[in-house]
Amino acid sequence: MATAAACISFASPSPARVVIRRQTRASASASATDRQEVVSPKRRLPLRKVPGDYGPPVVGAIRDRYEYFYGPGGRDGFFAARVRAHRSTVVRLNMPPGPFVARDPRVVALLDAASFPVLFDTSLVDKTDLFTGTFMPSTDLTGGYRVLSYLDPSEPNHAPLKTLLFYLLSHRRQQVIPKFREVYGDLFGLMENDLARVGKADFGVHNDAAAFGFLCQGLLGRDPAKSALGRDGPKLITKWVLFQLSPLLSLGLPTLVEDTLLHSLRLPPALVKKDYDRLADFFRDAAKAVVDEGERLGIAREEAVHNILFALCFNSFGGMKILFPTLVKWLGRAGARVHGRLATEVRGAVRDNGGEVTMKALAEMPLVKSAVYEALRIEPPVAMQYGRAKRDMVVESHDYGYEVREGEMLFGYQPMATKDPRVFARPEEYVPDRFLGEDGARLLRHVVWSNGPETAAPTLHDKQCAGKDFVVLVARLLLVELFLRYDSFDVEVGTSTLGSSVTVTSLKKATF
């Protein structure tokens, strides 16, 4: 089976080539080993010039933008066409938004599992202000601060801010499972009411409310519905996120209108200032204990507030808004046989643990965990990663080495890396038991939704998601709650601006 990391060689005046093994500064030997073993550093692949071109200034970028948003096959088709045209999974192209939002849209695109992981190595790539790609939204949308997602690990504030997020996710850890079950139990009750009343239930609408309520109650101990924020939180967050990501989104408007308003101009932050201020006021009060911890770490209180808001609203709520419908979509399509296997596993593990959902019970549900990993593989919630080369180097695909120069922007389209047919059999299929057993465990290092391999743990010195394990946990809890209650379910699937639109059309209650 093909391997999945980039082997990097530094260009040097000396005829000798120094090969750098990929390794984090994490103290855990398992994480370091996982990152090194993804590819053998002894390979010497033939060098090839990175194919592709950027076209004329401005015109080439606009051409690529139109093809990306409006061409045949959508964005998957945009990248697949480049791979076919150049017979290469490393190519030069322009990434949206381009003119007149991004100063320089030119990237070297990494479109396979072998080249993609170079983006995780912060000794080789700089991550400064690259969270959203070739442009950065105005800091007016984040209280005037560059929040953690935009910081490179070399910056002095990165470590204390990431430490604060680890604290945020862990300081009420005993409340996570019971609060999730309470909030999402209510969600399924509301969905049953909708099914009885109108014959269908919009999972996304109910999930938005439940996700925000759970995050605030589980991690902060505050119910936003009982604050001045009321039930407006999800609506305010969605609008705020739109203003940050609009240059990268398609809303289904007429092409010329959409491309002019969303992709060529920035939406004015002033239009969402009142909404953002309402969110910030809530978190100043609700997150006082976490802000106090931030102050102890040397973080100014206001900076802590805006980082907590971003972490919970953009990263965590945004992640659950995309991932949970994705998970329900793929499982809904998997059918009753898969549902039966999951229900049997979930109910057996809970029964064997005194009827309680505990971490021990969850550990006895390997199929549930595999089903979550498979959703994260086939449709990762964040599809794109960026990094700027810190020095001249050679990035390797499966077959060739490509010289990249210092300062060039590297871009990875994750769905092509995690559906690489040289790594995954039946890559376009959702296979819920893909990660079971020893062979499945070996594949986990190629699951990289968290901006790092699933087999590695996030540290203060990398950009791997601080909430990596939390996200997998709550996704597993969703399946546990679902299959404790129901034997099977049916869905209708559509598209939405962020992720999938999922309507549940039936819920078959548990019979065993």
Swiss-Prot record:
Reactions the enzyme catalyzes: (13S)-hydroperoxy-(9Z,11E,15Z)-octadecatrienoate = (9Z,13S,15Z)-12,13-epoxyoctadeca-9,11,15-trienoate + H2O
Induction line: Transiently induced by red (R) light, far-red (FR) light and abrasion in dark-grown seedlings. Not induced by FR light in phytochrome A (phyA) mutant.
Keyword Plastid listed: yes
Cellular component terms (Gene Ontology): chloroplast membrane
Enzyme class: lyase
UniProt: heme b binding residues: K127, H158, K162, K463, C465
GO MF annotation list: allene oxide synthase activity; heme binding; iron ion binding; monooxygenase activity; oxidoreductase activity, acting on paired donors, with incorporation or reduction of molecular oxygen
GO biological process: defense response to fungus; jasmonic acid biosynthetic process; oxylipin biosynthetic process; response to jasmonic acid; response to wounding
Annotated EC: 4.2.1.92
Binding site for (13S)-hydroperoxy-(9Z,11E,15Z)-octadecatrienoate: N315
S-S bridge residues: none
Main location: plastid
Keywords carried by this UniProt record: Chloroplast, Fatty acid biosynthesis, Fatty acid metabolism, Heme, Iron, Lipid biosynthesis, Lipid metabolism, Lyase, Membrane, Metal-binding, Oxylipin biosynthesis, Plastid, Transit peptide
Tissue expression from the record: Expressed in coleoptiles, and at lower level in leaves of dark-grown seedlings.
Pathway(s): Lipid metabolism; oxylipin biosynthesis
Entry cofactors: heme b
Keyword Plastid part of the UniProt annotation: yes
Subcellular location field: Plastid, Chloroplast membrane
Region feature (Disordered): 23-43
Transit peptide extent on chain: 1-25
Pfam families assigned to the protein according to its UniProt record, in alphabetical order: p450 (PF00067)
Function: Involved in the biosynthesis of jasmonic acid, a growth regulator that is implicated also as a signaling molecule in plant defense. Converts 13-hydroperoxylinolenic acid to 12,13-epoxylinolenic acid.
UniProt family annotation: Belongs to the cytochrome P450 family.
Protein name: Allene oxide synthase 1, chloroplastic
Organism, scientific name: Oryza sativa subsp. japonica (Rice)
